[in-house]
Amino acid sequence: MNIIEGKLNLDSNTKIAIINARFNHIITDRLVEGAKDAFLRHGGKKENLSLILVPGAFELPYALKKAIESEKFDAICCVGAVIRGSTPHFDYVSAETTKGIANVSLNHNIPVSFGVLTTDTIEQAIERAGSKAGNKGFEAMTTVIEMLNLTKEL
């Protein structure tokens, strides 16, 4: 049986964008730091990493689509944080953001990772942005690196 999997290394020319939803920036800044750390630890060059900032999670799919269409990047890592409040807004934003990123990803030939936290509390978000539960920005970047390399093998 042949096993095909992506490796966790980047060549010196790989260009990756992080698209960051600034809303809840206390959390998302930490996700970006985790993603940058993963990029550099796996062989990426600082000058080949771009950070695209959008106001909130709902804007991620549109920015993702435009970034892909620019043909400047080999892969894209989306990060953000949607934290439940006292209104149904959380449900709409988290669902549409997830669907939007998935739809854009499946309709283009470029690896995309989903590092958008959807949590019930700020404490859960903090845990996933670099404390008890690791850093989901770091994980999203390693995922997109692995998928980029897997794509080359398929």
Swiss-Prot record:
Its EC number is 2.5.1.78. It is an enzyme of class 2 (transferase). One of its GO terms (cellular component) is riboflavin synthase complex. Keywords: Riboflavin biosynthesis, Transferase. 5-amino-6-(D-ribitylamino)uracil binds at residues 23, 57-59, 81-83, 114. Pathway: Cofactor biosynthesis; riboflavin biosynthesis; riboflavin from 2-hydroxy-3-oxobutyl phosphate and 5-amino-6-(D-ribitylamino)uracil: step 1/2. The active site is at 89 (proton donor). Pfam families: DMRL_synthase. (2S)-2-hydroxy-3-oxobutyl phosphate binds at residues 86-87, 128. CDD domains: Lumazine_synthase-I. GO terms for biological process: riboflavin biosynthetic process. SUPFAM superfamilies: Lumazine synthase (SSF52121). One of its GO terms (molecular function) is 6,7-dimethyl-8-ribityllumazine synthase activity. It catalyses: (2S)-2-hydroxy-3-oxobutyl phosphate + 5-amino-6-(D-ribitylamino)uracil = 6,7-dimethyl-8-(1-D-ribityl)lumazine + phosphate + 2 H2O + H(+). InterPro entries: LS, LS/RS, LS/RS_sf. Catalyzes the formation of 6,7-dimethyl-8-ribityllumazine by condensation of 5-amino-6-(D-ribitylamino)uracil with 3,4-dihydroxy-2-butanone 4-phosphate. This is the penultimate step in the biosynthesis of riboflavin. Belongs to the DMRL synthase family. NCBIfam families: lumazine-synth, PRK00061.1-4. This is 6,7-dimethyl-8-ribityllumazine synthase. It comes from Campylobacter jejuni subsp. doylei (strain ATCC BAA-1458 / RM4099 / 269.97). The gene is ribH.
